[in-house]
Each structure stands twice: as C-alpha cells, then as structure tokens.
Amino acid sequence: MRVGDRSRYGVSFFVMCVLVAAWQCFVMALDTQLGGIGNLLHEWHVVAISLANALLLLSPYWLIPRRWRWLVWIPMALLTLWCLMHMCYCRAYDDLMPWRSLSLTDNVNSTLAASTLSLLRWQDLLVALPLVALIVARLLMRGHSEQLSAPAVKPFLLSLAASLLFGAVGYLDGDTNYARRFLHNYGNRSYYARNGLLPYAAFTLHEEFRSQSLTDDQRADLNRFLLEDCPHYTDNVYCKVSHRNLVLLIVESLHTWPIGMTIDGREVTPVLNALVDADHQGVIYAPHVLFQTSHGHSSDAHFIYNTGLLPLRDGVVAVNHGDGPYPTLAGALEGYDCREVICTPGMNWNQTVTARTYGMDTLYTREDLMAAGDFDRHQGFDDAAMTAFASRLLPQLREPFFLEMVTMTMHTPYTPGRVPPSWILKSDTLNAEARGYLSCVHLTDSCIGALLDDLQHLGLAQRTVVAIVSDHTQVYLNRVKGLTDYQATPDDWGIPLIVAGCDTTLRYPSVIGQVDVFPTLLDVMGVNHYGWKGLGYSILRYPVAGAIQPRNMSVIGDSTALTPHQRQAWDYSRLFILDRHNRSY
C-alpha cells in the first residue's frame, strides 16, 4: 500500500471521525429528549458526554493494523443509521427502540417502510450530512502525509485520556446519585441523554438479557399482591341480561378529538357522534382514556384489552412472552364462540400465536380477506375489506359469540394513495397530516356504521354489546393547532372507550387507563364469576381519576386520587408475565 493511502487513516482522519460521531450522538439527544435543535447552546454537558463516548467508541482504531483501518467506516455508518432509526422511532412512540425490536423481522412490510419514511424530517440531515462530509474529506486527503509507527499505542492511550477528561466534565455533578443515574432506567431516551451512547447500550443490553425467572421472594410478594390488593367481587349488578354477544373493535390510532368535529359544516364521525350522543341510552363513554402501550405498540393494546394486564416497559410482550397462558376476556366468556379478524398478516406482532393465547377459536388474517376478494372490491382499504368480510361471517357465528376486530386504515402515514378520497382533503382549515388522518377516521367511522347496520339487519343488535376502543395515540390535537406537547391536555391526546348496547348509561369525563377497560367489560357482560378482574378498576364501581403511563411512570390525571394498587401495578404485571407458566386460570 502506498504511503498516501496509509496516511489517510492517520490522526487528522481519526479526529474528524470522533467529531462526526460525537455530533451525531449529541443531535440525537437533542432531538429525542432535550427539546430539539433550538436548545443547541444550552446543553454543553451533553456535548462533553458525547465527545467522551465517541472517543471511547473509536479508540480501538489505533489498535487495528493500518491496512485494516478502513473498517472504521462500519461503526461510522452503523452509528448514522442507529441515530436516524431512533429519531424516527421516537417521533412515533416517544421513546428509543429496545434492542429486541430489531429482531421483529416479521413486522417489516410496505406499511412499516412507508411509516418510517414519513417520519423523516429535514433536521435529520444534521446526522446524515456529517458522514457524507467525512467521506469527501477522506477523498481529499490523498496527498496528505502523516507518519505513525505501528503499533499506535500512544494515540490509543491519548484517546482514552481525552475520553476520561470529557467524561469528567460531562458526568461529574455534586448533586448526582450515580447509582440511581446509571443503574435505574426511567425511560430509554432520558437515560441516553443523561449518560451517553455506551452506558445506554451496556445498560439496556443487560436489561434485555437478564434472568427472566422469579425468585421465591418475588413470587411470594406477587401472590400476596394478587390475594390482598386485587379485587375479588363476584356480583353482576351492572348487567341485567347475561350471555349477550360481544363485538370488540380495536381501532387503529383513534383519538377522541375527531368525535363531534365538523369540517366545512359536515361531521367527520357521524356514526360515533350518534353513539355518544347525550340522549343515547345504554352507552358508556369515557373520552379521556390514557394509552398505556409501550414498545409493543398496537400489540400491547391488544394484550391489555384481552388480559387486563399491563405490558412490559422494556420489551414486546406479544413477541417475547406471547405464548401464555394468561387470564383472558375470552376465558371469562366461557362457552362463547370466539373469533378474531385482523387486517394484517398473522405473523405481524406474533398474532397467530397471541390469538390462541387470548382464547380465540379462529383467527382470520389479511390472507383470508384477500382470498375472499374483499381487498380488491374495496380498493385496498383495510377497514372496508374487513367490514365486508365480517358481514358474511356474522351469520355463521354461534351465539353467544365474541368477535374481536382490529382495524388498520388509520395507520400512519397519511399520504396520497393510502388516504381514502373525501371532502376533508380539499379543506383548507387544517394541515396536510390532519386532513389525511381525518379522512381515514371518516372512512373507519363509516365502516363501523356498516357493521352496526349488519347487526341490526341480522337481528343481532338487541343481543349484542359493541365495545369500541383505540390502540394508541397518533395525531395530537395540540400539534394540529401548532401548540407544543407541554400545552397538551386530555382533550388533545385522549383515546375513547365507547360501549353500546349495555344496561348502564354513563359519561365518564375523568382520566382512566387502558387497563381499566378489562374489568369494565366484565361488569358490562356480567361475567364476574371469573376470578381474574385485571390490574385496573371497573369505572362502574370505582372513581378512577388518573392513570400511569409507562414512558417515565408519570401520573396523568388526578395524582391525589391514585391508589397504591395503581402505582404498583406495572411492577407486579411484569412479575405476573414472567411467572405465567406457574399459574392456572
């Protein structure tokens, strides 16, 4: 190799690599946790932490023989992709991606690709362009000469020393409890911003692969909690007619704020509006449900609604622990014909397995809808195809039945070709994202109306409870209005619970959690003989006024009304999931 070739991987190039890596780590911390690029000049301790981590990450560069130093491009490229991936993920799910999510290859499809591309922003060039500039600089260094003897131990030691120096500037803080700082994780993005890339990687990898079995003390503590702190009532005072059918609609990304909204004088959700009308009897309506999904996203919501448990804060329960057994809504509805219809392939989020775990007798997937020709007849719009499929399925069900349906049309991105045509797209009163989202909401609302019409036409409406819930948030109203997340209220982020066809009429304005839906449905269906009531509270029995979200375990709603049970439920749910094979229901 020529001297000119060797010199291109000398001190100057190493320094440039360190600066690029540190800048990328810093930008990612700004974008995901520290309020964005506007706070660039206020976070010098994070700059020091980023430099310390970049130096430590790249210091092995000096221990590699010169002819192999081109390998430095591998960590540089991977770091660039890693930062971009987490920035996009955080925009969708408000946290960094857990390592196990990288193994969810069954979820990779055109919808995921389109969703990811829609999350890219112009500021992401601040991560990508430095790598491009480094490539250009490397090409321009052909004639530059630096003579270093091998092995380059001295530069390696200097790199470590510089890393320690910058680490001292960034990490040393007289008021910091270092054990708590480095050994406790109250949110991935917060941990990363406070501690940097390498501590974050080490801590989260350790958490991902630590022992998944309970100690005897943990099992005894869990049993005490389940026996003493969980409800055990058996009465059915809120249900006058037993053995009704149940249709559970889990609607993708449905917020409460579009309900009742008009655009250019027309209702966005006429069907849902009619259901929640104040004069409509036999309807429970809770507009301020707090989403409690974690890294499993939609699958976490399915898990909560079907089991009454809370998901893992540090993994994807449907994939890593989807085999059960768990107590389930279908288990409480003993003797029911239990079916599930989804718009996606069964492999997505491990739904082929979880459908059995949740007690479903039959799962119908995207393949079934396509084989029936419903996608072709409805221009590929998922919810319309699913409703058409359900219209033929309903007459075949044995009563009483439990039919769970999971919609998909309202999944991001809201781009041309994926958004159904409507007058909403022509309105100039909202931004493009809101117009696309509301067009999808309008289509799904009409599909719900078609399902209700089918129930009425088949003579099933009077014997059927229809529960409509949402999996998680997507388009906050405060963002549509141009306000910040710090100005968000329950009206901006709330997702709805609507239960129609029951014996109770209730409008519940307080904040509740998704985990409170399970026991509420047990009350509505009159199946409290089932021993498991979930980790939430039925809003027909208890004055729930707040809930805890998993990102940083913050209380949303009235913190003074929160019970010790609600505060402890996340930890005990994790123990329950890990100990599920030692339990029977």
Roles of regions detected by a PLM:
Residues 2-202:
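Transmembrane and membrane-interface helices of multi-pass
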Residues 4, 19, 211, 215, ...:
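Intrinsic-disorder-associated interaction segments
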Residues 26, 60, 108, 218-222, ...:
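Generic structural signal of hydrophobic/aromatic residues within well-ordered alpha-helices
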Residues 61-71, 176-205, 212, 265-270, ...:
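Short, structured coil/loop segments at alpha-helix boundaries
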Residues 88-101, 118-121, 210, 215-218, ...:
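A diffuse structural propensity rather than consistent per-protein peaks
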Residues 167-249:
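Membrane-interface segments at or immediately adjacent to transmembrane helices
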Residues 223-585:
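Solvent-exposed soluble domains appended to multi-pass membrane proteins
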